[in-house]
């Protein structure tokens, strides 16, 4: 069983993540995790924090000489800004007279619409939003990307690779029918300002971000994660919570600012006739069973089908709007403008990297659940044995 947990606050000393159930033999280094975190900071339209934020990675346990040992893997992502926040975010009590001189310690009593601020204050009984936003912040996703790197490395050694890309920013979208990126395209994707695989569309996206910046606005968009090399049969149809698409949807909806998820052609299929919505099963010229298309996105009946997995997540515009939205100052009860701090105009490219990490974690869990193995070599043998024993009459090949 693979499970994971994160802890820490946005301006605390560090974020910490633990992932358990990773087999021995996964090749993993601090630099690989750092590279993944650097990808999370990419993207045109990011705020000032990305310019000086450096993720200091420390692997605390579970790895020796670049190889996982079979125990829980613990990763710390240090906060280089901690000295500025040491007294304000200290775990132990700090004298009131010391805090009184700290401008950063001013109570945040004007909750931001679209954030967890107001409801979090209601739920936990806080009189200001600082305790809420510190944990609710998307900064926490740095830990998920770190843990997702562990999962990705595990999957990669089994021949399963992931790639994410941006398919829309606001109303600017990649035209239907354009080629999908493959793992070999990751470097080129990361070099694109918005991690878009279509150059012409990327240029239009940049213009959209520039226009929003001038108007004091923020933008959302849609990202897509693709997984190549999956065997058929991950997930199950027997219970709702074991369905692979259900688990992927939950994981992606758990990312800050994600408001919608679709697998394959998703919502588009709702407007089609049944004969144009599904993937017919035929034999190719070599007699192998194939599907004529991949509208299902690589999942049928809650199970992977051995084709490319394709899942999308829709991100709303960032709620910290420079123009500042209307709110109520809870300390006075009067109308006010919401608290504003540095923020991004568009963080959709980063959302793609986070989504990729979450998909990796779900798939790694599904692989471990289906095939087991205390070592990567054992897992690989189990997968081979499973595939070798699929009856010839049911043998298929991905699109």
Swiss-Prot record:
Top EC class for this record: lyase
Pfam family, one: Chorismate_synt
UniProt EC number: 4.2.3.5
Cofactor(s) it depends on: FMNH2
Catalytic activity line of the entry: 5-O-(1-carboxyvinyl)-3-phosphoshikimate = chorismate + phosphate
Pathway: Metabolic intermediate biosynthesis; chorismate biosynthesis; chorismate from D-erythrose 4-phosphate and phosphoenolpyruvate: step 7/7
GO cellular component, one term: cytosol
Record-listed FMN binding positions: 135-137, 256-257, 301, 316-320, 342
PROSITE patterns hit by this protein: CHORISMATE_SYNTHASE_1 (PS00787), CHORISMATE_SYNTHASE_2 (PS00788), CHORISMATE_SYNTHASE_3 (PS00789)
GO BP term, pick one: aromatic amino acid family biosynthetic process
Cofactor note as given: Reduced FMN (FMNH(2)).
Functional note: This reaction introduces a second double bond into the aromatic ring system.
Protein family per UniProt: Belongs to the chorismate synthase family.
Subunit structure: Homotetramer.
Family matches, as PANTHER family: CHORISMATE SYNTHASE
Protein name: Chorismate synthase
Gene from which this protein is expressed: aroC
């Amino acid at each position: 069983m693979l499970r994971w947990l994160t802890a820490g606050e946005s301006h605390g000393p560090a974020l910490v993540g633990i992932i358990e159930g990773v087999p021995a033999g996964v090749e993993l280094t601090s630099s690989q995790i750092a590279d993944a975190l650097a990808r999370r900071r990419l993207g045109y339209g990011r705020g000032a924090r990305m310019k000086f934020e450096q993720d200091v990675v420390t692997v605390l346990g579970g790895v020796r000489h670049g190889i996982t040992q079979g125990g829980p893997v613990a990763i710390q992502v240090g906060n280089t800004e901690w000295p500025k926040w040491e007294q304000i975010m200290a775990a132990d009590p700090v004298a009131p007279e010391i805090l009184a001189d700290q401008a950063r310690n001013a109570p945040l009593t004007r909750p931001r619409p679209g954030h967890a601020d107001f409801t979090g204050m209601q739920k936990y009984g806080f009189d200001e939003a600082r305790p809420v936003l510190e944990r609710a912040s998307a900064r926490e996703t740095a830990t998920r990307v770190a843990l997702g790197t562990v999962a990705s490395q595990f999957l990669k050694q089994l021949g399963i690779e992931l790639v994410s890309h941006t398919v829309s920013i606001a109303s600017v979208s990649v035209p239907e029918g354009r080629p999908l990126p493959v793992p070999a395209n990751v470097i080129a994707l990361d070099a694109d300002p918005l991690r878009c695989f279509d150059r012409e569309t990327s240029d239009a996206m940049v213009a959209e971000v520039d226009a929003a910046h001038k108007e004091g606005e923020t933008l959302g968009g849609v990202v897509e994660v693709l997984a190549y090399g999956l065997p058929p049969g991950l997930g199950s149809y027997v219970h709702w919570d074991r369905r692979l698409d259900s688990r992927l949807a939950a994981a992606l909806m758990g990312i800050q600012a994600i408001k919608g998820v679709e697998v394959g052609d998703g919502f588009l299929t709702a407007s089609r006739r049944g004969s144009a919505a599904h993937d017919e099963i035929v034999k190719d010229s070599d007699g192998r069973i194939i599907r004529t298309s991949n509208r299902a996105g690589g999942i049928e009946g809650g199970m992977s089908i051995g084709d490319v997995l394709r899942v999308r997540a829709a991100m709303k515009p960032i709620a910290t709007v420079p123009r500042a939205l209307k709110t109520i100052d809870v300390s006075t009860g009067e109308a006010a403008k919401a608290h504003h701090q540095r923020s991004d105009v568009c963080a959709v490219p980063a959302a793609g990297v986070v989504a990729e990490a979450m998909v990796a974690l779900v798939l790694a869990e599904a692989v471990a659940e289906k095939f087991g193995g205390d070592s990567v070599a054992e897992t690989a043998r189990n997968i081979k044995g499973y595939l070798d024993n699929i009856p010839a009459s049911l043998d298929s090949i991905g699109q």
